[in-house]
Amino acid sequence: ERNADNLKKYKAICRQHIYKNMKGMYRQPVGALKYPFLVPGSGQYANQLWDWDSWLSDIALRQIIVENGTSDDREELIAYEKGCILNFLSYGGGDGWIPICIFDNTEERWQLLQKINPWKTNMHKPVLAQHAAFVVEQTGGDAEWLREGFYNLQTFVGKYLNYHRHKATGLLYWENDEMTRVPSTVFTEARAPSSSMP
């Protein structure tokens, strides 16, 4: 039954479960993923780094740590937060394309680019720079860890602003609905290229 008492009870149960299992979202470097990283917590994502899943998982973990964490928990999380971004930036380049996801067995960037057109293939959502800014803020303004990959972050943002932005509205868009996890519906199946909004 949906009532205030049950809501309170189930919220407490959910929070306790999350507090107990939060470090199950942490992953060590493996294969193509050279840095520690975060996953949403499901076994389906064992060694997969996804664009906005890592960002939103990080925000959730930060909230969990604010509510129930220690200074050691905060310090430990930093490597995983940074690693999400650094793993993605390691797949960047001058054209600005960065993949939506990286698996432990993802080929090297040059191999991926032989199979796709980076100008017509979806890439990481525009939240990559936002995620980096979030981590910089959480670490007291330290951005030195971004130095090596910063060019790739700049070209990534530039690609969205120059090639994936609707001129009339200024809204950023995806090239298509591939890997956006939008259910296949009449609204997506016949959508024109370059018209899906992130």
Feature locations, PLM:
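Extended, well-ordered alpha-helical scaffold segments
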Residues: 6-17, 70-89, 142-161
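A short secondary-structure junction motif
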Residues: 21, 25, 91-98, 105
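Catalytic cores of carbohydrate-active enzymes
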Residues: 2-12, 28-30, 95, 99, ...
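The feature captures the catalytic groove of carbohydrate-active enzymes
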Residues: 43-48, 100-129, 133-145, 161-198
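Low-complexity, Ser/Thr/Pro/Gly-enriched N-terminal "stalk/linker" regions
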Residues: 1-49, 83, 87
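Alpha-helical support elements that line or immediately flank enzyme active sites
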Residues: 47, 51-95
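Well-ordered alpha-helical scaffold segments within catalytic/enzyme domains
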Residues: 1-3, 56-76, 127-143
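Aromatic- and histidine-enriched alpha-helix N-cap/loop-to-helix transition segments
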Residues: 48-59, 76, 119-127, 148, ...
